């Protein structure tokens, strides 16, 4: 059994790839015919991911049962003493991620069957999903930095295709381009870091790189500043992929893609890749504490930034997007505190409840589109929602569970993982713990703000005047003739509600696997550290920090309830009128988009114009003048082409005499 699971692990990424390749090849070769086979194509891809999920859980069961880590390598290229190996590595952290990604992916695919059922590019969407899942699974299994970079780029390519899936929409096309460009910045640094580490260690293997770097740092063969630079270059990749400040700006715009892919990107694939890589590189980063401090500070800034901007969002999906940025900041804070178990545990718990929240938002948007139309300006605006719990009870209940989980209220999953991060931060950097604790209160507030605006109160979708106001504010035209006759929403079909119900189970229960007095998740990943932590566990240390976290989260929920459930205060209007500077700062997203636009976008365009001007005035002119000079020289020389032998003899004689005179002088 153990041997069979390890031997079949290579099939986990291959099966979804084969499915995506077959359907994709069919779309290219027989587009019309394959598009007519919508259900068979989807069934093929769902089945391939389903088999991968079964194999992933077999591998995870092996690791839980004590199976040793295994690595299968083959020589890809060799030259002299250099040998580039590819293959796969199976260990507890990889097995856990395989199970997570495949589980969320298959639930998203089932959900997509309902959500995308009327889309003309249904088959293309499933093809992209299959390729996306395959790329992430292969990334998880990669045994070295070079192989992980290959699949890192494939994940980025798939996210570009899926964010811009509705490329007819200008906003979607621009969002895909923005995601691509921002991630290229991070990936450029990542590639430089990989090459620099190979230069320093002559290896791409994670463990060998860490061991040799430690030896080089200790004997002084690599300066401390160079080690810091290499580690920070490597970190640029995760900064972009996991949306860390200041490379987070692509993630909110990525909401222009279909909602199922938002769930997959935010829960288990693209943004998870960065955190996973930092966990893989923990043996290296632990050798350079200065880098860990930088990672922790960036994570703290990111978690506060995301939470603060989420406070004023009216777009349901963008509110969840900034929530993801904030939670990713918590994960990086854990990594910077030297607590990869805490970071990975929060990655796991967050994946389940954030996938549920995004799929729940998709269910809401799907229902709203039947009332207000398919324009995201209306279908995703919470000012047109309200009271949806009455008509969409399953979506409402599961969304509520997700809000409680992410707010860190016990005994749901988010409490255990977030509390562990805050505990590690308190031990390492008390100031960062304070920011993280305050952010926990903001998280509870904005999540219940989302819930109350969407599911409680009265339905506002039939307010024609409000629709017109929102469209005009967005610079769009309003046509009363196009308003829908349907007056109310309804619950989504079983394909969309079943994944919500399934995801609600781990959102409630999985946190118990990481309880501080019996951390089974930690025992799987780092058994020695988990045993030591269990021995030194103290209720006297745990309870004060846990109570502080729960109290501040409860305060956030209470304030949200007063403002958005009972409407005792108009919090939004009060902040906008009394704290204009702060409100404008948050509305403009810390002005980071404008800064990027001014410095990088306008700067690069200005530089391009100057280069174009230089090309036209100097280079083009030089080329033209060279051509004209050649033509003039040719015309002048043509006068010597007389056809008279005497003239040619005279020229030869003159040339010989000239050479004799020149050489005599030399």
Curated annotation (Swiss-Prot):
Pfam family, one: Proton_antipo_C
A biological process term (GO) from this entry: ATP synthesis coupled electron transport
Molecular-function annotations in GO: NADH dehydrogenase (ubiquinone) activity; quinone binding
Spans through the membrane: 8-28, 41-61, 90-110, 121-141, 145-165, 190-210, 220-240, 259-279, 293-313, 328-348, 396-416, 428-448, 497-517, 542-562, 643-663
Compartmental location: Plastid, Organellar chromatophore thylakoid membrane
Catalytic reaction list: a plastoquinone + NADH + (n+1) H(+)(in) = a plastoquinol + NAD(+) + n H(+)(out); a plastoquinone + NADPH + (n+1) H(+)(in) = a plastoquinol + NADP(+) + n H(+)(out)
Cellular-component GO terms for this entry: organellar chromatophore thylakoid membrane; plastid
Cited Gene3D superfamilies: 1.20.5.2700
Membrane keyword on record: yes
Membrane topology, from the record: Multi-pass membrane protein
InterPro entries on file: NADH_UbQ_OxRdtase_chlpt_su5_C, NADHpl_OxRdtase_5_subgr, ND/Mrp_TM, NU5C-like, Proton_antipo_N
EC number: 7.1.1.-
Record keywords, A-Z: Membrane, NAD, NADP, Organellar chromatophore, Plastid, Plastoquinone, Quinone, Thylakoid, Translocase, Transmembrane, Transmembrane helix, Transport
Keyword hit for Thylakoid: yes
Function: NDH shuttles electrons from NAD(P)H:plastoquinone, via FMN and iron-sulfur (Fe-S) centers, to quinones in the photosynthetic chain and possibly in a chloroplast respiratory chain. The immediate electron acceptor for the enzyme in this species is believed to be plastoquinone. Couples the redox reaction to proton translocation, and thus conserves the redox energy in a proton gradient.
Similarity comment text for this entry: Belongs to the complex I subunit 5 family.
Subunit structure: NDH is composed of at least 16 different subunits, 5 of which are encoded in the nucleus.
Protein name: NAD(P)H-quinone oxidoreductase subunit 5, organellar chromatophore 1
């Amino acid at each position: 059994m153990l041997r069979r699971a390890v031997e079949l692990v290579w099939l986990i990424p291959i099966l979804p790839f084969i499915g995506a390749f077959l359907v994709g090849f069919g779309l290219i070769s027989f587009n019309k015919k394959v598009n007519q086979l919508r259900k068979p194509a989807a069934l093929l891809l769902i089945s391939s991911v389903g088999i991968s999920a079964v194999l992933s859980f077999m591998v995870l069961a092996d690791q839980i049962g004590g199976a040793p880590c295994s690595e299968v390598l083959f020589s890809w290229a060799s030259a002299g003493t250099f040998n580039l190996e590819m293959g796969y590595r199976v260990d507890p952290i990889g097995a856990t991620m395989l199970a997570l990604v495949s589980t969320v992916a298959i639930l998203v695919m089932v959900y997509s069957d309902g959500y995308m059922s009327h889309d003309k590019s249904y088959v293309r969407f499933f093809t992209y999903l299959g390729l996306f899942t395959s790329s992430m699974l292969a990334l998880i299994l990669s045994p070295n930095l070079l192989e992980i970079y290959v699949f890192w780029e494939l994940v980025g390519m798939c996210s570009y295709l899926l964010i811009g899936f509705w490329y007819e929409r200008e906003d979607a096309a621009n969002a895909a381009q923005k995601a691509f460009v921002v991630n290229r910045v991070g990936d450029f640094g990542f590639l430089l870091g990989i090459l620099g580490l190979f230069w320093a260690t002559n290896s791409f293997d994670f463990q060998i790189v860490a061991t040799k770097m430690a030896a080089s740092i200790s004997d002084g063969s690599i300066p401390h500043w160079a080690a810091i630079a290499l580690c920070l270059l490597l970190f640029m990749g995760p900064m972009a992929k996991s949306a860390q400040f200041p490379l987070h700006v692509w993630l909110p715009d990525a909401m222009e893609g279909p909602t199922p892919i938002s769930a997959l990107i935010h829960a288990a694939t693209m943004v998870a890749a960065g955190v996973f890589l930092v966990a893989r590189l923990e043996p290296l980063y632990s050798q350079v504490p200065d880098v860990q401090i930088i990672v922790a500070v960036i994570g703290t800034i990111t978690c506060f930034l995301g939470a603060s901007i989420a406070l004023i969002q009216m777009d349901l999906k963008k509110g969840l997007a900034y929530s993801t940025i904030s939670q990713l900041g918590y994960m990086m804070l854990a990594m910077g505190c030297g607590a990869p178990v805490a970071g990975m545990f929060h990655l796991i718990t967050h994946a389940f409840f954030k996938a549920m929240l995004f799929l729940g938002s998709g269910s809401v948007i799907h229902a709203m589109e039947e009332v207000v139309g398919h324009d995201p300006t209306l279908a995703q605006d919470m000012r047109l929602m309200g009271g949806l719990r009455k008509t969409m009870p399953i979506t409402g209940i599961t969304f509520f569970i997700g809000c409680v989980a992410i707010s860190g209220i016990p005994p749901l999953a988010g409490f255990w993982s977030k509390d562990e991060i805050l505990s590690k931060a308190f031990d390492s950097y008390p100031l960062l713990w304070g920011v993280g604790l305050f952010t926990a209160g903001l998280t509870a507030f904005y999540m219940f703000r989302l819930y109350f605006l969407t599911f409680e109160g009265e339905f506002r979708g039939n307010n024609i005047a409000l629709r017109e106001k929102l469209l005009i504010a967005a610079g769009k035209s309003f046509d009363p003739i196009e308003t829908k006759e349907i007056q109310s929403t309804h619950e989504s079909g079983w394909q969309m509600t079943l994944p919500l119900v399934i995801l609600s189970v781990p959102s409630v229960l999985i946190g118990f696997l990481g309880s501080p007095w019996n951390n089974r998740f930690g025992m799987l990943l780092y058994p020695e550290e988990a045993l030591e932590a269990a021995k030194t566990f103290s209720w006297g240390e745990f309870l004060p920090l846990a109570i502080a976290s729960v109290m501040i989260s409860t305060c956030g929920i209470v304030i949200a309830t007063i403002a958005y459930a009972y409407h005792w205060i108009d919090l939004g209007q009060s902040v906008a009128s009394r704290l204009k500077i702060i409100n404008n700062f948050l509305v403009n997203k810390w002005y980071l988009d404008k800064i990027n636009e001014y410095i990088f976008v306008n700067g690069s365009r200005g530089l391009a114009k100057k280069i174009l001007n230089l090309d036209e005035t100097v280079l083009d002119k030089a080329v033209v003048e060279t051509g004209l000079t050649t033509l003039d020289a040719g015309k002048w020389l043509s006068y010597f082409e007389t056809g008279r032998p005497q003239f040619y003899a005279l020229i030869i004689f003159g040339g010989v005499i000239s050479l004799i005179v020149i050489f005599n002088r030399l």
